[in-house]
UniProtKB/Swiss-Prot annotation:
It comes from the Bacteria. Coiled coil: none annotated. It comes from Bacillus subtilis (strain 168). SUPFAM superfamilies: Nucleotide-diphospho-sugar transferases. This is Protein CgeD. Pfam families: Glycos_transf_2. The gene is cgeD. InterPro entries: Glyco_trans_2-like, Glycosyltransf_2, Nucleotide-diphossugar_trans.
Length: 426
């Protein structure tokens, strides 16, 4: 029986971690392997790292040279994997990413499991997950255990912890017309879809030993999509992998000048590029919406919304809507005069809530809601933290807001995906 392992490593702009990933393959105690480095048109620093290893004849390199405009057409890592699979001639297929390292005995231990259990078609191992800061220092870690036979492996196993027989690929291709489903709608869970395909033919057998370690950086793919809703929230500062900051408003991402750096410092949401790039780029905003402003020598306080200044008529309205004086930004008289007047922000006890300010959190019947563009949206606590919505919620009842519709909830996208696919997570 053969024992060759084909490893498919996908990479994009992580030179330091990529080097560690490649080194971890070279240091395997099982040396009958081939490595496909499938790079998605990374920067020069990353490609320089790759070229250092191409003298090893077991290593093959493919650069996608994908055009930026085409990045939104498919789930890129799934596309890269599909490009490599037809050329893999190992008895077993294994996967790796540029932020994960194999432990030295990883291949030998999995090949051994197949040898001892001829009925095994797919195996998975325990994984150590390490969260690191911007300096690469460990903040925390936890383990993904491998202590059960999985008939539904989707959303439960990281794809760097799996090895399966190559013979399964023909069965999958015959049944589904392809290997990994690289439809863009699966951009953040392509491995889960592929595991579901594998589970049509075999369970995943466990090896409850830590055989790989994955590193989650502040800008890592996993951290970036964690707790993201299906749609970006108006009034958010966001950034992709290029670190450029945008202000999101009405479905458009507006570049933010350095003038407003004090606003987005420590409150910018990192999001995956495919998620960000679906929104077109607009012009630079003179003044972002959803901020408090006043003139230096004038007591009137305004809330900017829809490009208009809404005067907060008194202290009662200011306090009821949970505004904070520390958030007031002083602007010049000329800048203030360029803003058209919007409806004033008022509040009177025992009345219906009328014309409330947008992007404010409410607590209605013990549930959190975000009021945005005239609609109350249910919102999860994870999403409020993700988007730095730290304002104390405004207490209200459905009777107080009966004139406003209830809109689409802002819930983590993974929750929506799992419900839609009806895939078990326990």
């Amino acid at each position: 029986m053969g024992e060759k392992v084909s490893i498919i490593l996908t990479s994009y702009n992580k030179p330091d971690y990529l080097q560690k990933a490649i080194e971890s393959v070279i240091q395997q105690t099982h040396d009958l392997w081939e490595l496909f480095i499938m790079d998605d048109h990374s920067n020069a620093e990353t490609t320089a790292v790759i070229h250092k290893y191409l003298h090893d004849r077991r290593i093959q390199y493919h650069n996608s040279f994908v055009h930026p405009a085409d990045r939104l057409k498919t789930a890129r890592y799934a596309t890269l994997i599909n490009s490599a699979l037809p050329f893999a001639d190992g008895d077993y297929i294994s996967y790796l990413t540029d932020d994960t390292v194999y432990h030295p005995e990883r291949l030998s231990r999995m090949v051994q499991e197949f040898s001892h259990k001829p009925e095994a078609q797919a195996v998975y191992s325990k994984q150590k997950v390490v969260h690191v800061n911007e300096r690469g220092e460990e903040i925390s870690h936890f383990y993904r255990n491998a202590n059960a036979v999985l008939d539904q492996a989707a959303f439960q196993v990281d794809h760097c912890s799996v090895m399966h027989r190559r013979s399964l690929l023909n069965l999958i291709h015959h049944k589904f017309g392809g290997y990994w489903d690289d439809d863009m709608k699966h951009w953040n869970h392509g491995d889960a879809i592929f595991w579901a395909r594998l589970n049509n033919f075999t369970p995943f057998l466990p090896i409850n030993e830590v055989l790989d370690t994955t590193y989650k950086t502040p800008d890592s793919f996993q951290n970036a999509y964690r707790f993201l809703p299906a749609d970006l929230i108006d009034g958010s500062f966001v950034k992709g992998s290029d670190q450029n900051v945008y202000f999101f408003d009405q479905g458009v991402r507006h570049p933010v000048g350095e003038k407003w750096g004090f606003l987005y410092l420590n409150r910018t949401v990192a999001v995956p590029d495919p998620y960000l790039f679906q929104y077109r780029i607009g012009k630079i905003l003179n003044i972002p919406n959803y901020i408090l402003v006043k003139e230096a020598d004038h007591p009137a306080i305004f809330y900017i919304e829809a490009g208009k200044k809404r005067r907060i008529v008194d202290q009662y309205a200011f306090q009821f809507y949970q505004f904070q004086r520390k958030d007031i930004v002083t602007i010049g008289k000329e800048e203030m005069e360029t803003l058209p007047e919007g409806p004033p922000i008022t509040w009177k006890r025992s009345e219906l809530i009328k014309n409330p300010p947008g992007r404010r959190l409410f607590f209605i019947e013990r549930e959190p809601f975000l009021f945005l563009n005239g609609v109350f949206h249910p919102i999860s606590e994870q999403v409020t933290r993700k988007f730095f919505l730290h304002q104390k919620p405004i207490s209200a009842s459905f009777r107080n807001i009966q004139q406003f519709p209830i809109g689409k909830p802002f819930y983590p996208v993974y929750d929506e995906i799992i419900k839609k696919l009806n895939i078990a997570t326990e």
